[in-house]
């Protein structure tokens, strides 16, 4: 049974969404309340070195409709609040498992039939633990797929509002908007577990895809740390694999949205990929990567997100400053605005983009 604060939080989120009105391009999403629950494999940590305090798994309350908000970003904001209320979601911990269940329930409530993919991983001290990916598929007019991915774990010192409840929130909101729409391509939403521990979830998924599934994947879209940083970016490889990045930049220009890119930059740290796009890039799958940071600060390597007078010398991710209370007080309106822009961009990718 959920604790009273979980119930109150979810009732508040769903009441807000249900009372919202929707623009003509975003019809209300009808939710079939008769969809049976999905059986989930348990993911129990085995002696992790940074075990988070256990929490009861949140439950999404039944609703006749779960309509997109009046403004893009409203739903994403609600998911950030819910995920950070769970606490730090350390890889392999009970809190990570609760967050995965929250995402599974959210997809189910929207009318998807999500699946889980469990895997084993090892922490820095050699302890084995279990995590899982949560996967939901929106069939499109083409069987070719766009993978949209966001990790749902966090660092052990952080509630992970920016890194990466923000990415999950954007993904879940777009999933809500498009569930009843025709899309040019099939959209495969994946919430990755254990990103903070060597990108475990994305690497496991990519390793077991099989060559046919890789060949069928048009592009991977990575959503990570979207709420805090000063500037809004979309990255990719250069050359022929930059087709979606260039499309997004042109679309953003047409819609007066401040998305930019950094070209010819090595998006690795000491030769290692730094986010979930890496597992796909290694296998020849094109990617784009949405992120908010500031490449003009610090060592100009993208790690310093904001002016060094804020956060931990400009760092929000992996610090105690990565929470909504601090972000809202320090950067009023930023979280909501970033959610609006990134939801708009991902919605356009899913509903408008087509290869020539």
Predicted segment positions?
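A non-catalytic alpha/beta surface segment that caps or lines the substrate-entry region
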Residues: 82-139
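N-terminal capping segment at the start of a domain
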Residues: 60-97, 110, 153-154, 313-326
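Intrinsically disordered, low-complexity Ser/Thr/Pro-rich tracts
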Residues: 1-82, 109, 126, 356
